[in-house]
Amino acid sequence: MHPLMSAAPKISFVSLGCPKALVDSERILTHLRAEGYELARKHDGADVVIVNTCGFLDSAKAESLQAIGEAMAENGRVIVTGCMGAQPEEIRERYPNLLAVTGPQAYESVVAAVHEAVPPAHDPYLDLVPPQGVKLTPRHYAYLKISEGCNNRCTFCIIPSLRGDLVSRPAGDVLREAEKLVKAGVKELLVISQDTSAYGVDLRYAASPWRDGEVRARFVDLARALGELGVWVRLHYVYPYPHVDEVIPLMAEGKVLPYLDMPLQHASPSVLRRMRRPANQEKMLERIRGWRSVCPDLAIRSTFIVGFPGETEAEFEELLSWLAEAKLERVGCFPYEPVRGAAANEVAPPVPDEVKAERYRRFMEAQAAVSLRLQRAKVGKRLPVIIDEAGPTVARGRSKSDAPEIDGSVHVASRRPVRAGDIVTVKIERADTYDLHGIAV
């Protein structure tokens, strides 16, 4: 061993929760990898374990506590960070011997805790970090976080109390990170935040340098600039503010993917008011029709909550009726789960669990029928598909209408070899409720 080198300390890492937390994990790991730390595959082979927790729902907290317990049992030297870290008393009560507990976005505190537990062993002769940093996603796609926090105060959500108000990154910084990812081989950028369409409001839409000019910290301006990088750009967590209309022409022009992830949560005006969400869903239907007239290939993904406190059968029927008329391409649904500290717990009496379960079943059955009709309409069409997983005879990929992890897949038979990250044209031959099947042409 060279005299300036010593054995590299090893870190085991657990990342729980949403894609935004995954980006936090990538940032922490990139920093530590640059300092010479190595990643261990198992807890018992590491010098320290970091657990990035989720604290949004009680079930997520339970999963986080279980992960911490497993790390303590298998290793015993554990640092906790993430959203649940904003409530350290609850964690310390269960696990008093943790090395450190830090809150969300506390990158420097996590790194400092690692330094204290196991100091870095620098190796000046190795380039330890790839150009795109340490990524926890496959090489061909990456999450691009453009802001932290949220200015909304939805009654079912405690994110602002965990992550604070909206803090946007300068547009130039976002674009430089995106360009770096593209140069490293990323073919798809998934734009994320707590509230993507509010991007830049805290910066008063200030301009920042980018290439030979400037770009403003504004949702549409950023989307347009990202669209010039020559890769798929997918927009997530978009609230239906009026200026969202301006991004639809970019989708029609092929600058960004014709895909809009827009969490609408419900359709009954009275439920939406209890949620403190925009309540004019009739106008929302008009806007969706307008968007589709501009961009016929638009796929809208949304999530809904059933069994919200006080939800009546009539209010639930309003949701089903709206869903049938909207004909959304991609839909997720969750029975309401109480969140400690959320205002929703006090707005109305809870809906019984058995009623929530029954409404969830009816919702999913109704949407499955819509989804199957929309999927069958694609049979015979030729679609571009990005390959996620290559196989000996059949590969698995996604169309422009499908985000990783949350949407369906396209199963691709191909006579020629394909690799993860390839974008191939596929003739669709068969459709299921959520997946498509076809052959590469």
From Swiss-Prot:
EC id: 2.8.4.4
Binding site for [4Fe-4S] cluster 1: C18, C54, C83
GO process annotations (BP): tRNA modification
One Pfam family hit: UPF0004
Family stated for the protein in its record: Belongs to the methylthiotransferase family. RimO subfamily.
Protein role: Catalyzes the methylthiolation of an aspartic acid residue of ribosomal protein uS12.
The protein's name in its UniProt record: Ribosomal protein uS12 methylthiotransferase RimO
Organism encoding this protein: Methylobacterium sp. (strain 4-46)
Name of encoding gene: rimO
